[in-house]
UniProtKB/Swiss-Prot annotation:
Record's protein name: Plasmodesmata-located protein 4
Record lineage: Eukaryota, Viridiplantae, Streptophyta, Embryophyta, Tracheophyta
Subunit-structure text: (Microbial infection) Interacts with Grapevine fanleaf virus (GFLV) 2B-MP.
Cytoplasmic side, ranges: 310-319
UniProt subcellular location: Cell membrane; Cell junction, Plasmodesma
PROSITE patterns (alphabetical): GNK2 (PS51473)
Signal peptide interval: 1-26
GO CC terms in record: plasma membrane; plasmodesma
Membrane-topology descriptor: Single-pass type I membrane protein
Tissue: Highly expressed in seeds and roots.
Role description: Modulates cell-to-cell trafficking.
Cross-referenced PANTHER family: ANTIFUNGAL PROTEIN GINKBILOBIN-2-LIKE, PLASMODESMATA-LOCATED PROTEIN 4
Length: 319
């Protein structure tokens, strides 16, 4: 009996140890930190038409508008469990919402789904009355705008009748430059230029995503899912130029353009970590894994010890 229990507990411990790396890696992902949000104010023209005479029109219009946005966000959240990117248009007889969500390509599907759920909450809480919004978290982002439907009784059933956002022009949207500088480190600018140049070709080969370490820099680059390969490379090239200009001596920087974003982190005294190393995330995976495994093993051996004592006591009672 004791031998059987020991065997069972040993197998359980082995399964736990095998699953721990993925659990710890997932828990490390800083996917839900807000990077920035932009909510454009509500346009009064959306709430009323000059030809409208009904006093209840504004309330009804607000309801239909909120309904369209809610349907749009629900669809994105639902699809995020199966896809890392979705560009779509959803609406009713008065309003349509066009836009997309995108998750960081190397994050697991469950993290993508959680991240888009957070986007939906932030949008509802902070941008509920906006005509357009852009929300970026560390692990995903959301962009949408309202499309005016002027035809009475029009239904948004055929997406080809309505335009989504046009091809981006790679304009600067947001930047984050670390306050610490690398001015005293020789060769920093050249190293960053080489690392970001590698990202330009990397996103083309990687179908819009690149994450790698180059010498003492860690670089992450990604284009929006609807951006073609050649445009993606050009966008990252523009982002690299913006990083050199806007964050010249910063040891870490993030540049967000229309269509893509790029981030880099400089590690002058250590080699960058592998995948999932993001700005501000420096968790020691090996140490965490050792602590957890040790704790689980201790619990298992304590359980075996008590079972052994119980077995001896039972034998004594039988005598």
């Amino acid at each position: 009996m004791v031998v059987h229990l020991i065997s069972l507990l040993t197998q359980t411990l082995a399964l736990i140890i095998l699953s721990l790396p993925s659990i710890i890696n997932t828990s490390q992902l800083d996917y839900d930190t807000l990077v920035f949000k932009q909510c454009d104010p509500l346009d009064a023209n959306i709430l009323q038409k000059a030809t409208t005479k009904s006093p209840n029109y504004s309330n009804q219009n607000l309801f239909l508008r909120a309904q369209a946005l809610s349907s749009f966000l629900r669809k994105l959240e639902s699809e995020s469990s199966r896809s890392k990117f979705l560009k779509t248009l959803v609406g009713n007889e008065k309003h349509a919402v066009s836009g997309w969500f995108q998750c960081r390509e190397d994050y697991p599907s469950e993290i993508c789904h959680k991240c888009v759920g957070d986007l939906r909450e932030i949008s509802s809480r902070s941008c509920g009355n906006a005509t357009s919004a852009r929300i970026h978290l560390r692990g995903c982002h959301l962009i949408y705008k309202f499309e005016r439907i002027d035809t009475p009784g029009a239904q948004v059933n055929n997406h080809h009748k309505y335009k989504l956002f046009e091809t981006p022009e790679h304009g600067l949207i947001h930047k984050i430059c670390d306050g610490a500088t690398a001015e005293t480190f020789p060769g920093f600018e050249e190293m960053r230029t080489e690392a970001l140049t590698a990202a330009e070709t990397g996103v083309v080969d990687g179908h819009g995503f690149y994450e790698d370490s180059y010498k003492l820099l860690h670089v992450v680059a990604q284009c929006d899912g609807h951006v073609e390969a050649c445009d993606c490379g050009e966008c990252i090239s523009s982002a690299a130029a913006a990083a050199a200009e806007e964050c010249r001596w910063s040891i870490a920087g993030q540049i967000y353009l229309e269509g893509c974003h790029v981030g880099y982190t400089y590690h002058p005294h250590e080699l960058p970590n592998d995948s999932y190393h993001e700005e501000g995330s420096k968790v020691n995976t090996g140490k965490s894994l050792a602590i957890v495994v040790g704790g689980v093993a201790a619990l298992v051996f304590v359980a075996i010890f008590f079972m052994f004592l119980k077995s001896l006591r039972k034998k004594g009672d039988d005598c």
